[in-house]
């Protein structure tokens, strides 16, 4: 009871501070932007959720699908600018745009970015973190386009669409070149594409195996606690 009361007080305070705000400030922290998004779009925020391997929401689902494609996630460390990161971001935004719309998806995406400005034509960066932000922005945009064209699609269908686009057109990744970070749009080979499709074929619409699905237990209070914990761990 004490836990719930504490977070109700925090929510009320947040509403007083952020109510009426529809756009983010340039120097606004990620935590603040995420709280603002949740206040302005509570239904979408609940469906999108926070990443947790034990939860079913768009964010967790996108991570499960991406990690289980079998694509590379080790090239740069911390899943920054990798193939898995590209699929995760594009699928996440596609799912939001498909369920809601591209505007909601863009707001959700920007809430989790430190730098919201997409610098067209800038392919070289001084740090891995900045390069990762740049590829996320581009993959987010691709995902929104795919999701908007497939309204009310389940995430397994969207995952297949993302992989198809990756194979035919390409997604954005980052790599270190001469002590700088370079971003580029690359295609999956036909072999990588076929293998990734095979790997996700055995998953359900939430990216879970049959065993995971059978053992999954939902609980609103438990999910709220885990989401709050995940938000606290967000680095600004």
Regions found by a protein language model. Give the residues of each.
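Glycine-rich short-loop/terminal segments
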Residues: 23-106, 210-236
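Active-site or metal-binding loop neighborhoods of secreted/extracellular toxin and effector enzymes
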Residues: 146-236
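Catalytic toxin/effector domains delivered as secreted proteins or via bacterial secretion systems
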Residues: 82-160
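Bacterial N-terminal signal peptides that target proteins for export
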Residues: 2-11
């Amino acid at each position: 009871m004490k836990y719930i009361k504490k977070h109700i007080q925090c929510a009320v305070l947040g509403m007083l501070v952020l109510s009426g705000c529809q756009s983010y400030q340039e120097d606004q922290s990620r935590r603040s932007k995420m709280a603002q998004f949740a206040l302005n779009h509570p239904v979408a925020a609940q469906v999108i959720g926070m990443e947790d391997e034990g939860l079913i929401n768009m964010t967790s689902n996108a991570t499960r699908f991406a990690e289980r494609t079998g694509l590379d996630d080790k090239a740069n460390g911390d899943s920054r600018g990798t193939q898995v990161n590209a699929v995760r971001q594009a699928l996440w935004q596609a799912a939001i745009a498909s369920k809601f719309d591209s505007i909601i998806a863009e707001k959700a995406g920007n809430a989790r970015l430190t730098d919201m400005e997409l610098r067209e034509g800038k392919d070289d960066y001084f740090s891995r973190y900045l390069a990762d932000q740049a590829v996320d922005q581009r993959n987010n945009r691709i995902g929104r386009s795919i999701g908007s064209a497939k309204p009310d699609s389940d995430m397994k269908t969207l995952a297949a669409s993302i992989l198809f686009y990756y194979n035919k057109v390409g997604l954005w990744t980052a790599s270190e070149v001469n002590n700088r970070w370079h971003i580029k749009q690359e295609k999956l080979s036909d072999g990588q594409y076929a293998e990734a499709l095979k790997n996700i074929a055995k998953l359900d619409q939430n990216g879970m195996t049959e065993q995971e699905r059978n053992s999954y237990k939902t609980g609103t209070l438990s999910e709220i606690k885990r989401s709050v914990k995940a938000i606290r761990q967000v680095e600004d």
